[in-house]
């Protein structure tokens, strides 16, 4: 088993990954049947939850649920010596880490499907490295509040953001390097979580022309994400629980970096 496969190759993360590393098989929704009976030395599986971004999918979960079911059915017929699985961190509590019990809320079809797919992949294949992401920047697919703010049309309308909601903005350009480092370190579950920034901090420092369009803080505003990683020191020297500090996150999103 020496062939390699990237499952989810046509989404933003998959296109980026395949531009950095060679795969024998590039698999997406159009050719999933190629997986039947295949054996791979290595496979990268990108969860359908990260193909558009969780916010968009939650607005219409039916296609996502169908994708999960189809993927599980096909993966029953696949063998792989080593699997890298990229999935949503929504299955962890808002302040959780890799050791936190997963949220198994059966009444929430989105979370239930995420947990079902993660559990299946880890039981099906022998060596699996799980990566958890929340917001991803630089995809061009609106998968983070930063990308959405960058695309806001001119006007005076109030921004559709929660002022103090916490966002963990992971830059896509780090992904391949961070994954390979985890394999080198022998880690098998990693939260790729930078220090959170609020919508207010993000707009103030990276999109100052939008400051006057910010809403006021409301009691009903969501908390957001403040997950940490018990392995953060493998990526960032200070033992903060984050793989990047807030200053580096904001610097990478500054107007001159985006132009």
Cite the ranges covered by each PLM segment.
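N-terminal Rossmann NAD(P)H-binding glycine-rich loop of SDR-like oxidoreductase domains
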Residues: 1-23
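Active-site regions of enzymes building and remodeling cell-envelope glycoconjugates
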Residues: 21-31, 39-45, 59-63, 97-102, ...
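NAD(P)H-binding glycine-rich loop region in Rossmannoid oxidoreductase-like domains
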Residues: 26-98
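Glycine-/Pro-rich loop/turn segments that contact NAD(P) or position catalytic residues
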Residues: 69, 76-140
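Short, solvent-exposed loop/turn segments at secondary-structure junctions
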Residues: 10-12, 47-53, 89-92, 128, ...
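Conserved beta-loop-beta element that borders a ligand/cofactor-binding pocket
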Residues: 115-165, 188-191
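Mid/C-terminal beta-alpha module of Rossmann-like enzyme folds, strongest
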Residues: 176-233, 237, 241-259
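A conserved structural motif in NAD(P)-dependent oxidoreductases
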Residues: 168-174
